[in-house]
Amino acid sequence: MDHSARVYDDITELLPDEENPSPLVRLNRLVPEGSQLWAKLEWMNPFGSVKDRAAWEMVRDLERRGELGPARPGRGIVEPTSGNTGLSLTAIAGVRGYPMLAAVPSKVPAEKKVLLQVFGAKVEVVPDALCPLPGSEDGTIGLAKTHAKASAHRWVMPNQYANPHNVEAHVRTTGPEIWRQTRGQVTHVFTSLGTCGTVMGLSKFLKGKNPAVKVIAVQPSPGHDVPGIRNVSELDVSQLYDPKLVDEVLEIDFELAYTVAAELARHEGLRAGPSSGLIFEGARRTARKAPVPCGVMIFCDDVFKYASNMLKHVPGLQAEP
C-alpha cells in the first residue's frame, strides 16, 4: 500500500496495527555503549496513548455482542480510569455516538481531567489510588460498577482491569508490530505495570515467537505519584497479571520518572511522559549490567498531560520564567 496517498474515513482508521504501527525510534545519546534501545512511541496513536489499543478492542467486542450500538440505543460507556483509557474510550465514544462517564481518582493531574471533559466525558472524581486497584469494590471501580448495575439500560462497563480484550489488543497489534519492526530480532521488552494488559499481551505474543525474549516490567517505588502505573505489591488482586509471564520486575525511585522524562526530552527530543522515564531508566540499568542487543521500550504517552506534575518534581522548572 502507498501510505503517502492514503486517506481516512474517520479517525479510528488511524488506530495502530501491524500494517499501521506506532513508530519505533532508536535512542542514541543516552544508551550505554554496546546496547540498542528502541522506543515505541505510543503517544503517536490518534488519542494519545498505548490505551487506544485496548479501548478500541473492548468497544468493538461490546458492539459485536450487542452491548453497544443499535440494539441498545442511548446506552453509553462507564469506566474507572486514571486518564489514558478514559481519554481513548471518550474519543471513541464520541466518534461512535455513545455517552461517556469517567470515574477518576482525585489525584489524577488536572490536565487529564480537563481533557476528558474537552472530549465530552462526564467526569466524576472520587478519592482513590492514582491507578485504581483491580478487584476493588470501592473508589472509582466501585462507582463505575454501581452505575453499570443500577442503570444497566444507560451504562455498560468494559472494565479494563479484568477484560481479556485488554490483553488481546497487544497480542493482536503491539506484539506483531514489534516482531515485524525488529525483523524478529527483539531480545528484551520493557514496559510498566498498570492494568497489566500491555505486559501480558506482549509476553504471550513475543514469547510465543521466541521464548528467549526477556519481558521486563518496571515499577515505581511505593508511595509514588505517577498516574496509571503501580508497584507489583498492589497486584495481589489483579485479574490480568500472571507473574510467570514476566522475567524480571525492576523497582525504580519514582522521582526518576520525572527527571528522566526531562532527560529524554533534552537529549533525545522525545516528549515522553513520566512512566516512559521510569521504563527508560529500567532499560538503561539493564544495559549497564550486560549488553541489550535489541531492547524495545513501550513509551506509553507524552509529557504534556503531566506538566503540573513535572513542575513539582523536576528541579529548575518554572511556570513563569
Region locations from a protein language model:
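PLP-dependent amino-acid enzyme catalytic core
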Residues: 1-321
